[in-house]
Amino acid sequence: ITDIKVEIVKEVKIDGTRVDNVVVGETYTLPSGDKAAIYGYYCDGVMYKQGEEVTVNDEIDFTSVKDITVTLANGAGIRTQDSAGMRFQASITADDTTMTVINKQDAITEGMLITAYNLYTGTGDHTLDLKSTYTTLNVENGVKGGWYAGKEGTYCGSIVNIQKENYIRKFMARAYVEIKYSDNTEEVIYSDVSNEPRTVRQVAKAYIADSNSNY
């Protein structure tokens, strides 16, 4: 009698389109190269890199994560809700499928780095990123942060409870999007560094002038 081996096959999809049938327990290799999604592929809360091997235990539908751009708005604004302070605003631009992944707020998150201008210029190489060793405020938008004013992809980071002696101190910011992969590595996409450092006094004066113009 010949043993009969039954193999269970599961369908693998990318963006809803079948790309392969894989035996349960075996691996599927994600696309790589020029035709692959730039930042990899997402499934069930996990981001995978191009060319990564993924063990198939059930049907899988990966979402392509393509171009992501984050742009910092010029200048700064006054934060008036809750604790008062200085607010910087950024916006994320991405295709629809990538934006669905960003909206899940698990493997891809966003934030704002804020620091004093004199600390930034004192580095010598004028660098502001997540690895900066000088005093920097990292404001993560987070799951509960939502989008600013209900506009998808727009978020803010604020510095609050600023001491009076710092009202004339210039502050600046840089926005970022962070992708956390299954292999515990990260890729960070940054905006340009703000080219218009602002003091609390400057922003407050502009806010008052703008408010008065509405009467």
What are these regions (language model features)?
Residues I1-V70:
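Secondary-structure capping and domain/repeat boundary segments
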Residues D67-Y215:
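Short, surface-exposed linear motifs at loops/turns and structural transition points
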